[in-house]
Regions:
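Substrate-binding rim/cap in mid-to-C-terminal beta-strand-loop elements of soluble/periplasmic
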Residues: 2-4, 76-85, 113-174
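Soluble non-cytosolic domains of exported or imported proteins
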Residues: 11-19, 62-69, 153-160
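Metal-dependent active-site segment of extracytoplasmic phospho-/sulfohydrolases and closely related
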Residues: 70-108
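Active-site His/acidic residue clusters
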Residues: 22-67, 102-104, 108-111
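Loop/turn elements at helix/coil->beta-strand transitions in domains of secreted/extracellular proteins
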Residues: 31-38, 87-93, 137-138
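Solvent-exposed loop/turn segments at secondary-structure junctions
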Residues: 43-47, 99-102, 131, 146-148
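Amphipathic, non-transmembrane alpha-helical secondary structure
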Residues: 18-29, 76, 80
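Short glycine/proline- and acidic residue-enriched helix-loop micro-motifs
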Residues: 1-12
Length: 174
């Protein structure tokens, strides 16, 4: 493929998750004294699904499972950083996705063969790229210890409402 940026734009795929985590943590450190917004988009489990060496073989589900473990580790490390900085209590953290799961995206990593009886979309029909519920219904987890008691809800959430919701929380119009 075509890539701009010369050597500065090149990295080892195995190091992407760690690099993005380090950048996210540094942003929080640099902005801890004032309100901030950070969009921290996890690369995993998108292709190339190449886990860091310390995650290879850990899931028993091949590279796809290993990078999902790596993504989980990254989220945990980021939350620990918020705790370490004393920011966790009053920081809103949302973990969500832009689409449902996909197993067979043409990337030959044994995802289909190793899935066993696990159903990534649960009982829903469809996957990413379909308009069925399995393709468009996504997880939405919110953590805000100062204001939201931990629990489970089956309430409908539309990501398009997030801008208006955050503006309202901040007393702003958009």
């Amino acid at each position: 493929g075509f890539q701009k940026g010369g050597k500065a734009a090149q990295w080892r795929d195995e190091d992407m998750a760690q690099l993005f985590l380090q950048k996210a943590k540094q942003f929080v450190v640099d902005n801890k004294e004032r309100p901030f917004f950070l969009y921290y988009g996890l690369h995993q489990p998108h292709v190339p699904r190449v886990p860091n060496e310390r995650f290879i073989g850990k899931s028993g589900m091949g590279p796809r499972g290993d990078v999902i473990l790596e993504a989980d580790w990254c989220v945990d490390e980021f939350l620990k950083e918020l705790d370490r900085l004393g920011l966790a209590e009053n920081t809103i953290v949302i973990l969500t996705s832009d689409n449902g799961p996909v197993l067979d995206d043409g990337y030959k990593d044994q995802a289909v063969e190793l899935v066993g009886k696990h159903r990534p979309a649960g009982p829903l029909r469809g996957w990413k790229t379909t308009m069925y519920d399995g393709g468009v219904r996504v997880p939405f987890m919110l953590r805000w210890p100062a204001m939201v008691k931990p629990g489970v809800s089956d309430a409908f959430v539309c990501q398009m409402d997030l801008l208006a919701s955050f503006a309202g929380l901040l007393g702003q119009t958009y």
